[in-house]
Amino acid sequence: MNCYFYTFGCKVNTCETAGMQSLLQSAGYTVVSQPEEADIFLFNSCTVTASGDSRLRHAMRKVRREHPDALLVLTGCYPQAYPDEAAAIPEADLVLGTKHRSRLPGLLAELCQNHARIAAVDSYGAQDDFEALPCDTMPDNTRAFLKIQDGCNCFCSYCIIPYARGRCRSLPPEELRKAAAGFAENGYREIVLCGINLGFYGMEWDGSLAEAVETCAAVPGVERVRLGSLEPERLTEEQLSRLAALPQFCPQFHLSLQSGCDRTLRAMNRKYDSAEYAAICQRIRRYFPDCAITTDFMVGFPGETDEDFRDSLAFAQRMAFAAMHVFRYSPRAGTRAAAFPEPVSYTHLRAHETLSD
C-alpha cells in the first residue's frame, strides 16, 4: 500500500516523519511523493498553537473529502496532549501519540485487517527511554536532521509541550555516532542536531550538548554540524569553548527569548531574566564574533501591558537579532496560563509593529 505524509511543526517532527517512513518501508509499504497515489495518509501533528490544531483538522477534512476510501492516521503532539479530542476526530482511522511510534507498522496492519478505528496513545511516565526511529536519509533535504533529545522538564506556564513529549531524555553518544555515520555514508555532509529542549542533551549521564556536537563532528564525512532551537540558560562558558574548538561547527544559534520584559518572563515561568539572557548572547558573541543569533518573540501574553510590551521590544532591538519569529500568544488547555486573565487586545497590531521595526 502507498503512504503519503503531512508534517506539521518543528524539525523534530521532520526527523520523526523520516523515521516513520523508514519503518513503513521496511514493513513493505511504499512512501509516495504525490497524494493522488496514496492509500494511506499520515498526519504528523504539532499542537504548540490553536492555529496549528486548526490547520491539521482542515487538512484531514480535505483529504477525507478527496479520498473517501483512504486510511487516515493521526500521530504526533496533538493526540499525545489531547488524546480524547484526537480520538473524536471522525476522519482519523488510527490515532497514535508521540510515544511508541515503532508500533506504527503493526497498528496499520491491524487496521487494514479489522477495519475498526484504533486509538493507541500511551501515556508518558517519569523515566521513559529515548525512542530512536531508524533513519539514514531525509527525502527532499540536502542536510540531515538528527533528533538527539526529546521531552522537556521546564513547564513554562503557556506551553503544552511537556505534556505532549514527556520528560527529558537523550540519544546515547554511541547511537548518535552510528546515526550520523549512516547519514554520512548516504552522502550527507551537513547534520542539524535537533531536540525538544536540545540544551538538556545528556543530562541523564552528566553529559552536554557540546559532547553531542563533538561526537557528530568526529564522524568521517561530516563537514558541518548545526544546532536546532535552544533554550538559552544551558549554554555555559565551558560548552561554548568546546564548540569554538570544532571547525565543523556552524555558529548559528536560535535562542528562544519569548519576552524581554522581566515581569512577563516571571509570569511565563521562564528560567532566566533579561539580564541573564543578554549575558548569554554576549558570551556567545565573544566566542563567535560573526555568529547569527535568532529568536522567538511572543506578543499578547496574559497581563502584558503597553509598558511591558515596549520594554520587551526595546530589549529585542538591543539584542540585534539576525531574525525573529514573532507570534501571538495562543491559550493551550491544560497549561497554567490558560487560567490567566484574557490576553491583551490588539495583539495583531503589536506583532505588526514588532515586525515593522
Regions found by a protein language model. Name each.
Residues 97, 123, 231, 305, ...:
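Alpha-helix initiation/capping motif
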Residues 1-200, 238, 243, 249, ...:
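Proteins enriched for Cys/Gly/acidic motifs involved in redox and nucleic-acid/cofactor modification
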Residues 50, 170, 203, 271, ...:
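Charge-dense, low-complexity intrinsically disordered segments
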Residues 73-74, 81, 185-306:
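Conserved SAM/AdoMet-binding glycine-rich loop
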Residues 47-48, 165-166, 266-272, 339-344:
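Short glycine-enriched, charge-decorated loop/helix-capping segments at active-site entrances
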Residues 10, 201-217, 221, 268, ...:
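Radical SAM enzyme [4Fe-4S]-AdoMet core and its adjacent flexible, acidic
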